[in-house]
Amino acid sequence: MKKKFTVVIFTDLDGSLLHRDTFQFDSIKDYIKSLVNQGVIIIPNSSKTEKEIEKFNEELGINLPYISENGSSIHGLNLITSNFPDKLILSREKDELLKIFENKVPEKLKEKFFQISKMSKKEQENILGQKGVKLKDALNRKYTLPFLFKGNKNEKNKLLKVLNSNSLTLQEGGRVLNLCDNINKVKSMNRVVKILKKTEDKIKTIAVGDNYNDLDMLKSCDIPCLVFNDQFIQDQINIDNLIFSNKPSPEGWADVIKTALLKLNY
């Protein structure tokens, strides 16, 4: 019997599906595969680079479509339907963003801005939690610039105001801030849903995250899911029908997805 609707899961990776510190997901790998085999469409929507998500797919053993660098580019929709695009780029390249940053941001704010790519390898390893090839993949960015901002809240708000007035944004992840084009996870998610609706009559979206840069994505889906993060205050989140786990990733990811699918009677 044909299902009444198609389930599409948009998921953050670090701290949501992958363990926040070890980046492992072995304990839920079979569950993810079983979902795909049931016809559930899973789309990683992450700040990770193309290389990093491609290697995640290799480890999983399935080529999933994905959104990389905080919504900057969409990949592999042709894996869902052959006439869908293989790649959509929604961002200007990082060099163009940096040029705007250099020309428009006041010097006093620039002094508080520390690019990860210009730090020593040891500092990069400590901040990103990666080494060797994995560190290289994490730094292999085309559309975003990860950085630390060592200013106060008022200075950060001033920086954000300058960036927004020049069509740039800040995306806050678990480890770093990212300088991005005027794009984010939810804009890319909505773009994908619009494309999928060309062939799917009814779609139910589940979004999974664990941090501040996931909240807009959670607010814009049918079933929002938050994976436990002890560095994140859940009580401050005002999202209707929010499902949240008591366990961290990766087990917490499986818990919220199971609850979401029950809610959908899937």
Describe the residue ranges of each PLM region:
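Mg2+-dependent phosphoryl-transfer enzymes with acidic/Ser/Thr/Gly-rich catalytic loops
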Residues: 2-4, 25, 176-266
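The start of beta-strands in P-loop NTPase/AAA+ ATPase cores
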Residues: 7-9, 64, 205
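Anion (oxyanion) recognition and catalysis
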Residues: 36-37, 164, 219
